[in-house]
């Protein structure tokens, strides 16, 4: 995960959302590929760290089936990346911070363990979660500017109980 964090820090320095990924061999841990987000600099919505690392690994190995490989990523994969991980037949996934907005391994969906798919993989989240989340928090805080106080939200009136009134029955 340290190597994935290094990749995330490179992304942050480039103004990219700091997510890093590393593909490694399961038998000896040898790193086969590493990548970081490049969506902004490439104007490519698919240029997520996981997808780029999987592409590199498949190219290097000469096969798209990477069942004897693992993937470490600093943020829980989104639907696209989780799908790519399943399609690449990755044998093991390790991720750092959970993603409450897009996480599709454990948080919002469980795509990597979906029983209807033809491949499921071992996965473990929360590895170095504080460090991984910290890189993201620092990046977005700097982007927003720390000195800015949070915007006050207007108070909302409570919702009425029961169904809304029917205008056709107005008396």
PLM regions: where:
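Conserved redox-active cysteine motifs that mediate thiol-disulfide chemistry
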Residues: 75-82, 87
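Zinc-dependent deaminase
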Residues: 1-11, 84-171
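A structural microfeature
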Residues: 32-33
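Immediate flanking context of iron-sulfur cluster ligation sites
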Residues: 63-76
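Short, basic and Ser/Thr-rich N-terminal targeting/leader segments
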Residues: 15-19, 67
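Glycine-biased flexible loop/turn sites that connect beta-strands or occur in inter-domain linkers
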Residues: 28-29
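Short beta-strand scaffold segments in enzyme catalytic cores
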Residues: 19-25
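A short, polar/charged loop-to-alpha-helix boundary motif
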Residues: 41-52
């Amino acid at each position: 995960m340290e190597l994935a964090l290094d990749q995330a820090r490179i992304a942050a320095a480039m103004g990219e959302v700091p997510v890093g990924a590393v593909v490694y061999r399961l038998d000896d841990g040898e790193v086969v590929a590493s990548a970081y987000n490049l969506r902004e600099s490439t104007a490519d919505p698919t240029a997520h760290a996981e997808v780029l690392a999987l592409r590199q690994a498949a190219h290097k190995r000469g096969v798209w089936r990477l069942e004897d490989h693992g993937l470490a990523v600093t943020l829980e994969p989104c639907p696209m990346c989780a799908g790519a991980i399943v399609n690449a037949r990755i044998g093991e996934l390790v991720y750092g911070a959970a993603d409450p907005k897009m996480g599709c391994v454990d948080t919002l969906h469980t795509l990597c363990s979906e029983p209807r798919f033809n491949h499921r993989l071992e996965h473990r989240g929360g590895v170095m979660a504080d460090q991984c989340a910290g890189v993201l928090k620092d990046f977005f805080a700097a982007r927003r500017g720390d000195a800015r106080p949070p915007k006050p939200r207007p108070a909302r009136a409570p919702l009425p109980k029961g169904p809304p009134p029917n205008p056709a029955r107005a008396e």
